[in-house]
């Protein structure tokens, strides 16, 4: 059994027991989160595809941790002008473990 749900503007394909990094959620570590924007649920031969969402579909997950991703370096450079700028960015994320998929 697996599902595709939407969180933080991105789509994630998950199955029970999977651990996924999502955009930062303002939820305490150890608490339970329910995602109701489910786009697809597949259970063996039965596949429920939403138009655009599956009615009554829900993905339940437990928050494992919060953190920051790898540093992304941005370099801006103007040729022949002795001008360059270097910036860095680390995106916050929330790591969740999928506990159940409800159709």
Swiss-Prot record:
What keywords are assigned to this protein? Ribonucleoprotein, Ribosomal protein, RNA-binding, rRNA-binding
Instruction: Show the PANTHER family listed in the entry.
Output: 50S RIBOSOMAL PROTEIN L21, LARGE RIBOSOMAL SUBUNIT PROTEIN BL21M
Q: Does the keyword Ribosomal protein apply?
A: yes
Q: How does it assemble?
A: Part of the 50S ribosomal subunit. Contacts protein L20.
Q: Which NCBIfam families match?
A: L21
Q: Tell me the protein's name.
A: Large ribosomal subunit protein bL21
- What's the family? Belongs to the bacterial ribosomal protein bL21 family.
State the GO CC annotations.
cytoplasm; ribonucleoprotein complex; ribosome
Concerning HAMAP family, the annotation shows: Ribosomal_bL21 (MF_01363)
MF terms from GO for this chain are: rRNA binding; structural constituent of ribosome
Q: Name one GO biological process term.
A: translation
Function, as annotated: This protein binds to 23S rRNA in the presence of protein L20.
The encoding gene is rplU
